[in-house]
């Protein structure tokens, strides 16, 4: 339920804005560094502007506005945040979860004799969707309930709510059509019960974080939710149904995901137009919105989200093709922005530490990247310090594990990490030693590999249970070539630099390795990660290496289930590295214990397990962290009150912004 209800951690895959970090460390507090600005003189007071902002975003919209239930692209998630903001608990400017008094009247936790815990939640009366329909407890129960049905499995929901909620597992499997752990108490009160195994949770208060969805909008006319005393169930025209895929409900749901108009939601803005062909989305103020957790309502009437192109973004800003360009990370682009400001453009630059890092991600279920020695070797064949200096030009720093420099855990562990993490510094000899130790000692004929003159290295995988695509048969043996398939996204400067400094570098060739680059679009990247085509059909694993970025949308650090070997959860998108480290002290064990074996508030115990987890991760290296960075956002000087930081993105910051000169 934690991941479904609160979406505590979002894997943010950034395309061309996947870049680098700052040489300065962030704040020692969990809250992010406050954005700093460089401004040109204000525009003339007589200048009039339309009450509209055009936002340029480098991440392509896919049209999945489900808040991460299907996919979790950065731009799609941003749109969802703009149109859905009635969670009972939400993140504040520091990335910490807080109660949302606009929505939440009261809540309580009851610890039950069987070890489970029940959260009783009462919402305020008078809340409505953007179409004026009232919001009740049923709407909150429905969203939680939906992820516990066979329907969620059929559509490959990323939610694991069925694992956390009492009775969710048997409903998910289709044994029953109700969830005993989701109850409707009265019109504005519901309860959610968490199973004993997960009731003990370091971030336990977030179990009270639920949000509303309109039943008929998502499933179709006549659908609803009811509770006769045993738990909630889905209804159609008043009759109980077992909600499965492959029917009108699925058709309606898929159409609703990116509805071009009539998108029923409950946030500061409403979608008024979405054009998938141009990846452009227009939103206008929702007049029914009651305000965020601080009661703040937006004043800027219209937001238009457009695709920012790497080659033309500066011209787009100059000519009015876009007003705000968020998340600039390329060192050249940052310097271009600062030069534009110095030259008198009506812009201000907001800088803030990134809560995330750019990376190479390995898929450890196919090809050579299944083997840890290969992952180590790739890391040592890339000069990351030079990469960061070249790409970031002083705005980035190298990190050695999954953390951001602004995190409290990192700040409290600097000495420990320096003493215990391997940096995988550029070292061709060390890389070759790793490969030899890992058994990559043969040629394509089975002879001993001695140098690059022999071509690619090969490994005897005859007796190993591995994915053997691309292998050759020699004298009854199965030999795997040291050829890594790499998928990268188009118009991506990070990919361009990796091609030069890694894939096409002489050091790689001299080591008997080949990295084959395939360039494609965002949907192709998602297919490569989740082993699914655009229609959700499973496809064979093909790529062993990708480049993207990871970001945290809150100060919560929870990787539980990210290393699971449960095939149902893997099918939902968990463990997207396909690395199954299941023994005691492994990634799965440590990530689970970090949050489920620690009492809320026991930071020292949490930190100890966090450090163990980071060390184990660094040993197995499922990814190569490239950089932690400072983001820059370009904002017009005629926009006031726009403040952005690590955990406070455009969707949140725009609520506090205004255009005093708006007509």
Residue ranges and their predicted role:
Residues 153-157, 163-164, 272-287, 304-366, ...:
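Extracellular/periplasmic solute-recognition and catalytic clefts
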Residues 56-114:
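N-terminal lobe/hinge region of extracytoplasmic solute-binding protein
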Residues 381-416, 497-505, 533-663:
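Detector for C-terminal structural segments
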Residues 92-93, 206-298, 302, 312, ...:
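Gly/Pro-rich hinge or "lid" segments in bacterial periplasmic/extracellular proteins
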Residues 157-245:
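Surface-exposed binding/hinge segments that line
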Residues 199, 203-205, 389-392, 440-490, ...:
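Bilobed periplasmic-binding protein-like "clamshell/Venus-flytrap" ligand-binding domains
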Residues 105-160, 185, 191-193, 316, ...:
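Aromatic- and charge-enriched surface segment that lines or borders ligand/interaction sites
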Residues 282-284, 371-506:
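Append "and occasionally in soluble cytosolic enzymes with long acidic Gly/Pro-rich linkers
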């Amino acid at each position: 339920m934690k991941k479904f209800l609160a979406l505590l951690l979002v894997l943010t895959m950034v395309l061309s804005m996947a870049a680098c970090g700052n040489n300065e460390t962030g704040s020692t507090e969990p809250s992010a560094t406050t954005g700093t600005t460089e401004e040109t003189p204000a525009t003339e007071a007589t200048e009039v502007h339309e009450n509209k902002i055009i936002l340029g975003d480098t991440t392509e919209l896919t049209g999945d506005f489900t808040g991460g239930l299907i996919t979790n692209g950065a731009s799609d998630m941003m749109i969802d945040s703009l149109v859905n903001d009635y969670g009972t608990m939400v993140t504040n400017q520091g990335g910490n979860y807080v109660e949302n008094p606009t929505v939440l009247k009261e809540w309580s936790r009851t610890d039950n004799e069987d070890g489970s815990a029940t959260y009783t939640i009462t919402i305020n009366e008078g809340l409505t969707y953007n179409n004026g329909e009232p919001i009740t407890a049923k709407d909150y129960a429905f969203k939680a309930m939906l992820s516990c049905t066979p329907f969620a499995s059929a559509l490959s929901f990323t939610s694991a709510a069925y694992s956390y909620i009492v009775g969710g597992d048997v409903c998910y499997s289709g044994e029953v059509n109700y969830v005993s752990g989701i109850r409707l108490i009265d019109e504005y009160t519901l309860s959610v019960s968490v199973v004993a195994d997960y009731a003990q949770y370091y971030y336990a208060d977030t179990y009270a974080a639920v949000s509303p969805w309109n039943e008929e909008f998502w499933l179709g006319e006549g659908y609803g939710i009811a509770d006769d005393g045993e738990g909630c169930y889905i209804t159609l025209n008043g009759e109980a149904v077992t909600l499965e895929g492959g029917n009108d409900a699925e058709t309606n749901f898929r159409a609703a995901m990116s509805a071009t108009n009539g998108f029923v939601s409950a946030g500061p803005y409403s979608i008024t137009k979405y054009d998938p062909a141009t990846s452009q989305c227009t939103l206008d103020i929702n007049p029914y919105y009651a305000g965020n957790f601080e009661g703040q309502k937006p004043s800027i009437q219209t937001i238009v989200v457009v695709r920012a192109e790497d080659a033309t973004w500066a011209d787009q800003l100059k000519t009015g093709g876009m007003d705000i360009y968020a998340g600039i990370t390329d060192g050249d682009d940052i310097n271009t922005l600062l030069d534009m400001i110095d030259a008198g453009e009506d812009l201000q630059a907001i800088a803030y530490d990134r809560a995330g890092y750019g990376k190479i991600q390995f898929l450890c279920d196919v090809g050579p990247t299944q083997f840890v020695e290969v992952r180590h070797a790739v890391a040592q064949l890339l000069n990351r310090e030079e990469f960061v200096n070249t790409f970031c030009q002083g705005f980035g720093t190298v990190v050695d594990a999954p953390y951001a420099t602004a995190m409290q855990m990192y700040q409290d562990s600097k000495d420990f990490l320096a003493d215990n993490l391997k940096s995988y510094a550029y070292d061709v000899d060390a890389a070759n030693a790793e490969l030899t130790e890992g058994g990559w000692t043969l040629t394509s004929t089975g002879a001993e590999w001695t140098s690059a003159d022999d071509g690619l290295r090969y490994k005897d995988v005859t007796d190993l249970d591995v994915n053997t695509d691309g292998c050759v048969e020699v004298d009854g043996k199965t030999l795997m070539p040291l050829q890594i398939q790499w998928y990268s996204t188009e118009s991506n400067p990070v990919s361009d630099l990796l091609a030069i400094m890694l894939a096409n570098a002489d050091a790689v060739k001299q080591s008997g390795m080949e990295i084959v680059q395939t360039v494609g679009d965002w949907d192709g990247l998602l297919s490569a990660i989740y082993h699914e085509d655009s229609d959700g059909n499973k496809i064979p694993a093909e790529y062993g290496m990708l480049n993207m970025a990871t970001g945290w949308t809150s100060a919560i650090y929870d990787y539980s289930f990210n290393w699971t070997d449960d095939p149902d959860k893997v099918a939902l998108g968990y463990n997207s590295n396909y690395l199954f480290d299941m023994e005691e002290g492994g990634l799965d064990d440590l990530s689970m214990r970090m949050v489920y074996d620690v009492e809320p508030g026991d930071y020292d115990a949490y930190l100890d397990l966090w450090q163990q987890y980071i060390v184990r991760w660094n040993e197995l290296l499922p990814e190569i962290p490239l950089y932690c960075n400072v983001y820059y956002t370009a904002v017009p000087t005629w926009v006031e009150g726009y403040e952005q930081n690590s955990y406070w993105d455009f969707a949140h910051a725009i609520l506090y912004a205004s255009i005093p000169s708006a007509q």
